[in-house]
Curated annotation (Swiss-Prot):
UniProt GO MF annotations: nitrate transmembrane transporter activity
Family: Belongs to the major facilitator superfamily. Nitrate/nitrite porter (TC 2.A.1.8) family.
Family matches, as Pfam families: MFS_1
Membrane topology label: Multi-pass membrane protein
Annotated compartments: Cell membrane
Keywords: Cell membrane, Membrane, Nitrate assimilation, Transmembrane, Transmembrane helix, Transport
Lineage, top ranks: Bacteria, Bacillati, Bacillota, Bacilli, Bacillales
Signal sequence coordinates: none
Membrane recorded as keyword: yes
Domain of life: Bacteria
Protein name: Probable nitrate transporter NarT
SUPFAM superfamilies named in the record: MFS general substrate transporter (SSF103473)
Residues passing through the membrane, by range: 14-34, 45-65, 69-89, 97-117, 137-157, 161-181, 211-231, 246-266, 268-288, 294-314, 330-350, 358-378
């Protein structure tokens, strides 16, 4: 394998993921500013924040498959070109409908995640795949970049101009990918239906999808709802709320490669069991207390476990589905994206009925317990095979 080419493509694709996730997550940190200029109800805010997740999740399956057909270069390039339109529309938005429309197509920025997790492993040996995919996953930091920088920029130049500045970033990365992307990337051309048929018979796909639904779903969901949640429930300043949300995202992002390394060196399923036990404890803390200190501790526990869990899961995926990597990565990552769609809506719904968000966080703990049971089952089956 060409290590030099692998490192260069890993670097380019990771930075491209940063740009994509910056665009995907731009609405959430700017919502406290947008809601001052546009008349939006709390229910509409929840929908607007959740909408980018829909396309960002569903497109991950075809994007993963297309990467194996045409290569990461062209999927990234055309994604950046198409993203220019919703960014432009968002900068002009003056109604909830326009915010929803532009937000929907911003989902393309999240869908490109499955491009790299399909492409990157082709350049590395099996004992380095966990680390390589973990490093690529650091591109999720694009969400934190928007959380940190967008509110500060909006305070200085206005939220509309902040959005428009992203047009420059996306254009730069389209050009970089056009000239530096690998046109000779190895292709895998197994018919899609044949891949789906084989995958549908493998229970491990359903297990990994459930686990990633929780870990990446928590990463996305907390990144979406925390800025507004902190402002509304703890009366925290808008910029401070963005910084706190950015810390959650950054911590989870930088721990993703740690999860990959742990998966390379130890039993990834057993590591996930420990990871989920701690995540469940964090969710229970959030469900039982409204104090800002305990809320922070619970959020940090979930951030740490989500980051490490994400890395562990995408160490397992290439080893379980080597022939159907593109489609499998797309399906698993799609479920992770969808995991970020529902929680903000559930939190808003539960809070409107009970006056508290505690029950919503308890649901996270319940899902964690269900996932834990499946991990124990898989671990027992793999032990039996080794014996």
């Amino acid at each position: 394998m060409n290590m030099k080419k692998g490192v260069s493509q890993l670097t380019l694709q990771t930075l491209s993921l940063v740009a994509g996730f910056m665009a995907w997550s731009i609405i959430s940190p700017l919502m406290p500013f947008i809601s001052q200029d546009v008349d939006i109800s709390p229910g509409q805010i929840s929908v607007i924040l959740a909408i980018p997740v829909i396309l960002g999740s569903v497109l991950r399956v075809p994007f993963g498959y297309l990467t194996n057909i045409v290569g990461a270069k062209w999927v990234f390039f055309w994604s950046f070109i198409v993203l220019l339109l919703p960014i432009f529309l968002l900068g002009q938005a003056q109604s909830p409908g326009m915010l929803m429309l532009s937000g929907f197509f911003l989902g393309i920025g999240g869908a490109i995640f499955s491009v790299g997790v399909t492409s990157v492993p082709k350049y590395f040996s099996k004992d380095k795949v966990g680390l390589a995919n973990g490093i690529y996953g650091v591109g999720n930091i694009g969400t934190a970049v928007s959380s940190f920088c967008a509110p500060v920029l909006a305070g200085a130049i206005g939220w509309q101009n902040t959005v428009r500045s992203y047009l420059i970033i996306l254009s730069i990365f389209a050009i970089l990918m056009f000239f530096l992307g690998d046109k000779n990337e190895p292709k895998v051309k197994i018919p899609l239906m044949a891949q789906v048929k084989d995958l549908s018979k493998n229970y491990k796909l359903y297990y990994l999808s459930l686990w990633y639904f929780i870990t990446f779903g928590a990463f996305v969901a907390f990144g979406i709802f925390l800025p507004n949640f902190l402002v509304d429930h703890f009366s925290i300043d808008k910029v401070d709320a963005g910084i706190r949300s950015g810390i959650f995202i950054a911590l989870a992002t930088f721990l993703r490669p740690v999860g990959g390394v742990i998966g390379d060196k130890f039993n990834a399923v057993q590591a996930l069991i420990i990871d989920f036990v701690i995540m469940i404890i964090g969710a229970l803390i959030l469900s039982l207390s409204s104090h800002i200190v305990l809320f922070t501790i619970g959020c940090l526990a979930i951030s740490i476990c989500a980051g490490i869990g994400n890395g562990l899961i995408f160490k397992l995926a290439p080893s379980y589905f080597s022939k159907e990597a593109g489609s499998a990565n797309g399906i698993v990552s799609m479920m992770g994206g969808l995991g970020g769609f529902f929680p903000p809506l559930v939190i808003t719904f539960v809070t409107s009925i009970t006056g508290s968000s505690h029950l919503a966080f308890f649901f996270l703990a319940i899902f964690g317990v269900i996932a834990l049971i499946t991990m124990i089952h898989l671990n027992k089956k793999e032990k039996a095979i080794r014996i």
